[in-house]
């Protein structure tokens, strides 16, 4: 039996396996040979989910893994290894995150730097999409929101579109005006890949043709009610239906989505529901336990670093 086939049979019933697992199960073979057989069969027998973490292609249709760590540190990922980044970073805005005697953000917050976008561009595949969930513009954050776009541009991203997330009937009466929106900011790494069906060209050629852009015309807005206080497990938890809608525009089934600031784990939940693979990164122990409880009964979920 050839080594690649042996590795496949050994791990096909497991959700994920590591290089160390492969070494231990084939101790009679040099580590360099084992790595080479896995690399030679990427896309054939194996798929790489993260650096040193793999699964067999037909073990399950999708997988979700949870990494404990800093979401700004992406060095564990190979270049051009991710099909989509969808994230809602805990943005620092000391004024907007307070109202009266209330503090709305109780977790660690920060502001993006150019290095953050440089790393996002490194791990994302050419033409694929970066989706950032951002606050609505106000007098306190407009400069930062502009800076984010500049960082993205300098890192090689192209501004694709912005779609408003209207939070259903919810209205927040804080600040200078009532608020009920956030922004879904979409960038592509270089020219957007061809996901958009070209009806005119398809009719002329008699074949399915696609042009540069998302998988369909983006809506005027995403009108989705936010998660209720009694149901949410994280202060800034996104609705799973919002994440599903976004992912259907920017990914295909079987692709790998990265959420580097997982929070409640909702992006992983949404990805699995619509047959996408997902990698979640979360730094807070409290949130990691919540994600485990949320997805722990899902046979496609595997926390790999604790």
Model-derived regions: residue spans:
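Core catalytic lobe of class I
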Residues: 2-288
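Conserved SAM-binding loop
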Residues: 291-292
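Class I S-adenosyl-L-methionine-dependent methyltransferase module
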Residues: 296-306
